[in-house]
Amino acid sequence: MYFIFIGKDKPGMLKTRKATRATHRKHVRNSDGPVRLMTGGPLAGKGGEMNGTFLMFEAPDHETAQEFLDADPYHQAGMFASRELRAFHEAAELPVALTQSN
């Protein structure tokens, strides 16, 4: 199953986001587990400051997807004011392949 996740940061969490970013990236890019990241990145406010997270990933089921998100260092640091996990049903193929950037 495909999932999308949107996490909106609590106000004043930019310092926490920057301090936790490396471990967050390692967690979401871990291809050894049952979850496979397709794409993702920080959401930005009008001024360009990071203020949230977007992830699109594949997981066997909703429970596994939720466990993956609960183990994310961003979540464990208490960074999010809100979190939304939704199943995603692909209706149209993407015109280009999504690739993971470093």
Please provide the spans of the model-predicted regions.
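Conserved, structured core segments of small domains
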Residues: 1-102
